[in-house]
A protein has these predicted regions:
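Single-stranded RNA-binding regions, centering on S1/OB-family and related RNA-binding modules
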Residues: 1-277
């Protein structure tokens, strides 16, 4: 069964001068214009296409890859605004994505980059976007373990820190003391559960917490040293940015960890890096 608003692998069932027709199952045949048809395509081949409804409400196919499919979040640029709402570039050249005014948490201006959730409007059947995320998140209590790895999408910034969507289901918060490296709205990254409070709110960390944090980083450092021939140009004098790029951890945690490895006799700390002992 094909899925509108998502990428599907469809069979070529007919060729024409202006393109090929794909098997759209219950929707019948779907035209893929020549500009989207891969060279050498033959009958019976399967092509990965994104399916959506065009401006005339006809089912259309494209090989363009959307920034976000139905059920996903993505950072998108506002291309224009009219009396209907804001239109964003979601990666499909033939048609921008509409965010109706009723689905906007704030009024936007052209040129802004905003985080958008893509969904299918049940009343009209159209694929649209929203910046009102609460109704798409799970309201049931979260069941996470401390130090459990999760997928994060940075959604908002406030005085408290960064609000993030956890595994596409729950809200979580990264407090300033747990922020290192560059974070921005729409960034997708791995994180860890710091704690789930009694009121259900989730505190997040970008690295494991407690003893597990140090043990995990120690293993990563030794593993990378072995891969790099026993030397890494990163020591306790290296920049926080360089350390984060290599290990996604803070400089403070890195310094403590290599200090521990040094005391254990596993590494030697040199003026320009660290070396396996």
């Amino acid at each position: 069964m094909i899925k509108i608003g998502q990428i599907n692998s469809l069979e070529v069932i007919k060729k024409a001068d202006f393109g090929v027709f794909l098997d759209g199952d219950d929707y019948g045949s779907v035209l893929l214009p020549n500009k989207h048809v891969p060279e050498g395509t033959e009958l019976g081949d399967h092509i990965e296409v994104f399916l959506y409804f065009d401006s005339e409400s006809q089912l259309a196919a494209t090989i363009d890859k959307p920034i976000a499919q139905v059920g996903e979040w993505g950072l998108m640029k506002i291309e224009g605004i009219n009396q209907t709402g804001a239109f964003v570039n979601w990666g499909i050249k033939e048609k921008d994505l509409l965010i109706p005014f009723s689905e906007q948490r704030a009024r936007f201006t052209a040129g802004q980059n905003i985080l958008v959730y893509v969904y299918t409007d049940k009343a009209s059947g159209r694929i649209v976007g929203t910046t009102k995320f609460n109704k798409w998140l799970d309201k049931t209590p979260a069941n996470y373990e401390v130090n459990e790895e999760v997928d994060l999408i940075i959604a908002e910034r406030s005085q408290l820190g960064y609000k993030a969507i956890v595994n596409g289901k729950h809200w979580g918060m990264i407090f300033p003391s747990d922020v290192f490296g560059k974070l921005f709205i729409g960034k997708k990254l791995k994180g860890y559960i710091k704690q789930v409070r009694e009121d259900g709110k989730i505190d997040l960390s970008l690295q494991k917490v407690g003893v597990a944090k140090m043990d995990d980083l120690s293993s990563k450092i030794i593993e990378l040293l072995e891969k790099k021939g026993g030397f890494l140009p990163l020591n306790d004098k290296s920049s926080p940015e360089a350390i984060f790029d290599a290990f996604r951890t803070s400089k403070g945690t890195y310094k403590k960890t290599i200090g521990g490895l040094y005391k254990q006799g596993k590494i030697v700390i040199e003026k320009d890096g660290i070396r396996l002992a």
